[in-house]
Amino acid sequence: MAADLAFEATELRLGLPGGGGDGDAAAAAARSSSGKRGFAETIDLKLKLEPAAAAVDDDDDKEEAAADDREKKVDIVGADNDDASPPAAAAAGGMKRSPSQSSVVTAAADPEKPRAPKAQVVGWPPVRSYRKNILAVQADKGKDAADGGGDKSGAGAAAAAFVKVSMDGAPYLRKVDLKMYKSYLELSKALEKMFSSFTIGNCGSHGVNGMNESKIADLLNGSEYVPTYEDKDGDWMLVGDVPWEMFVESCKRLRIMKGSEAIGLAPRAMEKCKNRS
């Protein structure tokens, strides 16, 4: 009995459970005959893991199946391309483009579109630029309005004729609209209310028609202050030397000076009046 047993069968060796050297086959046969599982198999079953050999076999099977599927697809596509006409094949190729290729083709086909203007943030750009933009918009609106009713806009622009009024000894300036008055008399009364320290001779609405140099001198000597004006030529003239309509068109500014200083303007006023007449 002892002679039948080999020492290798009873020899103890250190190693991992289920593994070993030359006695692996005998140990596997003994385990299969005894019906007991090894330590590694027990752990795999508890963790629901497949043995290493089975996992490798499954991976090989999956790779072979995937390769077979690819070969079948290539054969089918090749047969379709042979049967299809060139336009149909091109259309099929266009249908199977990747998303990146289709986006590139679309971008190349469409013309370049301008970017949408950004919404203006309140308070930016700075105030000066913002005001320039507002003025530009208002100018455009003004042009449109002028195109629609140019006669009305021209009449509105000519409706006012503001001129500055100064007086010798007065520390301030005033401004009057000559279009508000219809004669020299109305303008004289308005100036008297503005500057109560001067008097002015009365002139008719026709200016100095029928007035000679002596009458102008008497007018200047009889008043403490005399209104004068600067015309478009830059000459200082006496108020009342021309008809009212001509005065309104040519007056640039008014000055109320002392009568003694305005005496030298009388001959010049008479000369200019004669030349215009």
Curated annotation (Swiss-Prot):
Keywords: Auxin signaling pathway, Nucleus, Repressor, Transcription, Transcription regulation. This is Auxin-responsive protein IAA30. Highly expressed in etiolated seedlings. Expressed in roots and flowers. The gene is IAA30. InterPro entries: AUX/IAA_dom (IPR033389), AUX_IAA (IPR003311), PB1-like (IPR053793). Residues 64-75 have a biased composition (Basic and acidic residues). Its main location: nucleus. Transmembrane segments: none annotated. One of its GO terms (biological process) is regulation of DNA-templated transcription. Residues 24-37, 84-94 have a biased composition (Low complexity). A motif (EAR-like (transcriptional repression)) lies at residues 12-16. Residues 13-38, 53-119 are annotated as: Disordered. The lineage of its organism: Eukaryota, Viridiplantae, Streptophyta, Embryophyta, Tracheophyta. One of its GO terms (cellular component) is nucleus. Induction: By auxin. SUPFAM superfamilies: CAD & PB1 domains (SSF54277). Aux/IAA proteins are short-lived transcriptional factors that function as repressors of early auxin response genes at low auxin concentrations. Homodimers and heterodimers. Residues 160-259 form the PB1 domain. Belongs to the Aux/IAA family. It is found in: Nucleus.
